[in-house]
Amino acid sequence: MATFFVNGQAVTAKKNQTLLRFLRDELQLTSVKDGCSEGACGACTVLIDGETCRACVPKTDALEGRHVITVEGLSDFEKKLYTYAYGEAGAVQCGFCIPGMVLCTKALLDKVEDPTEEQMRYAIRNNYCRCTGYVKIIKAIELAAQLKKAGVIPEPSEADWKLGSSVHRLDVEEKVLGYGKYPDDWYLPGMTYGSAVRSQYPRARVLGIDISKAKALPGVVAVLTAEDIPGENKVGHIKHDQYSLIPVGGLTHWLGDPIALVVAEDQETLEKAKKLVKVTYEPLPAVHGPEEAKEPDAPRVFDEEENNVQAYKHVSRGDATGAIARSKYVISKHFETPWTEHAFLEPECAVAYRDEDGYVRVLSTDQSSHTTLHECKILLGSDKVRVQNQLVGGGFGGKEDMTVQHHAALITYLTGRAVKVKLSRAESLLIHPKRHPFWMDFTIGCDENGIIQGVKASVYSDTGAFASLGGPVLERACTHASGPYNYQNFEIEGTAYYTNNPPAGAFRGFGVTQTCFAIESLLNEMAEKIGISPWEIRYRNAIRPGQELPNGQIVGPETGLVETLEAIKPYYDAAVAAGKPVGLASAMKNSGVGVGLPDWGRCKLIVEDDAKVHIYAGASCIGQGLGTVLVQMVVTNTPLQRDDIVYERSNTWIAPDSGDSSGSRQTLITGEACRRACEKLTEALKTRTLQELNGEVFYGEYLAKTDKLGADVPHPVSHVAYGYATQMCVLDRKTGKIESVVAVHDVGKAVNPKSCEGQIEGGVVMSMGYALREQYPIDDNCKPIDKFGKLGLFRAHEIPEIKAIVVDKPGLDVACGAIGIGEITSIPTAPAIAEAYYQLDGQRRTKLPLSDTPYERRGR
């Protein structure tokens, strides 16, 4: 037992526990976030006697007489100061790391009035941010120092909320001050805790499940198995091939497969009870990777499948083989890219309870509340489910699949009790789908002027233990493997294989990150072979408005690849002239689902009793700032002002289904739906006031029409729009480390330029990790890394100068010309870095993470 002070108040911790658990579970100070519980991420940072400390490390018995400060304990001046500074700098995206960053800022500024940039970077060195790339957080610290010194905090200059304005995001204050709720921040009366007992073998037959001892343990509410599921057992984003609970006689597919759900009154009892569930297995040989999966006599990951092929794609246009044979210059290379973990700061969590209407209400952190609703209804065999999105602490594609939401819904449905189901960080690293590793063989042919004549490729990937989005990822990898260039001879074959490894699925870039590394690396090598610069070969081949991509689509006037090349040229020329090692790469990425699949945006504008317009769209805000985008869309397309508008977080009973927050689609697709609703509202406002419109609903819907892959039309429209980018990397010749990155991105109409810059900076740093040192090793038992701190993520003091340049290219006739930017920010970075290292030491690197660099992690 210990007595100490929290935010100036004396408190007593009767049992010895981590400070994190005491602050959250007993005092419910939920600004202190639980990101890893292993002392790695920094999301739980507090101040102890004025010094930063990760609250998951110290035990309460060691804190006798100490003074602890959380964000809740800041002075009113400090709360206003940090809210303004972080909002003005554009430093807030998903927000999960921000309270910890704020306390690091306070600790620094309490000691140093005018900190240097090095001191600012050092102050947050122990705190990860996966969204921002740290650039704007450092700017926020700098601004906070200036304002604190001046003693005056201005009001945000946000009179104009129209498209193109760098306004503060809607959710800045609740994220900076930590009162906004993520699912784990809910503590409901009588709430129980649930967790799954998972397979001990990557591939085994479950022969028996003995739950008797676990059920008999005092404090255990229920132990559920497959026999208790009232609806269908299997779930899946596209294909229902993932057991919610493995039945007796069922086959496990990876170490994350759930077998039983334990529900208890408290977390300590929960962990004890899980150990009392006894599962009898018949271990079977596992499939460790695609090379094994290909073999005719390989074990089948799924009994019901003929082989281990999860998806096959073939894309062909023109005569690639003939064009390459006729080319003056030909290069062929093999490339490999690794597994990558999303490393979002917020582990998966869901809370469920019975609401006042008798529905199971799920409070979720996911990328589509309506997808969660669909899966839960199938599992329960009931329509009495509602899903309410909470704040989402990062996604990047990793929260598209079911992990905990359906389990929480099942527990509440069967027990009638409120429940919280949360993954530990080790479970999160195991369970949600990762970025696919790819193995790729590419051949490119060019004429004497460097004009691409043809490209031919063959790729395969490890999609792991279930389908997830493996097929669409493979398809996108193949359709974008040609690069953003104007030529017509292209062919690629792609295969995704089931294995008993953890599943792979959506990850920022959606397969394009992998094939872009190959095609852009080949283009850099080809430029050298011909004797022209990497910039020149791209400029000669760049797709321009009215031209055909290799998939046959004629691009529109909004196409801005040339503009990105022209904008980067002065920086590129200056680096070359200075004799610096510099690498260049370009990319394109679709905005919207495309390829003939359903791709809809829906939005309701409802005038409510407060005489304000409330925006309802069933689309998750996962850090990209969708709510702010939609408010700016309404201000731009109606006579209303910012104060007339309220953004409502996604739910499934009022907000219409707007599809997943993936595919860089929400700004364009749901943005256009919102614009259409605005047209109707504007017309109504010509004759009536908002008070007179009380209760009126203005509905907008947009269905993006595209052609299926392989459609028999001369110029298939694969996607409504593409974003384009060119990035360059400059190395310090002495240290071999990255000196700077310049990233130029075409976003159509920039809705919020500062927010766009933040997306770019975050994507660059994320792919620096992908290119240089992040790792997700999997051992011979198909078991992956289980420590967040060992992933190899970049920290604030390690990042180079990053210059983000936003190119405004009008022309798209939907969503006021706005194109999504979420994914393309991370796509060209790796090949640009690889080329810079070639310029440094003459070594062509074709495997990621790159070898023989100062960033290489030994013993990988």
Regions found by a protein language model. Name each.
Residues 258-259, 264-266, 417-464, 671-691:
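Phosphate/diphosphate-binding loops
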Residues 226-227, 381-383, 414-419, 448, ...:
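C-terminal catalytic domains of large/alpha subunits in multi-subunit enzymes
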Residues 46, 174, 180, 349-354, ...:
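Short beta-strand elements
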Residues 1-156, 595:
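Signature of N-terminal electron-transfer/Fe-S-associated modules in redox systems
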Residues 145-307, 414:
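Flexible, low-hydrophobicity surface segments
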Residues 90, 165, 171-177, 238, ...:
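Glycine-rich loop/linker segments at domain edges
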Residues 296-378, 542-612, 692-717, 787, ...:
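Helix-loop-helix junctions that connect adjacent transmembrane helices in secondary transporters/permeases
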Residues 124-183, 565-570, 574-578, 604-613, ...:
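Intrinsic disorder at enzyme termini
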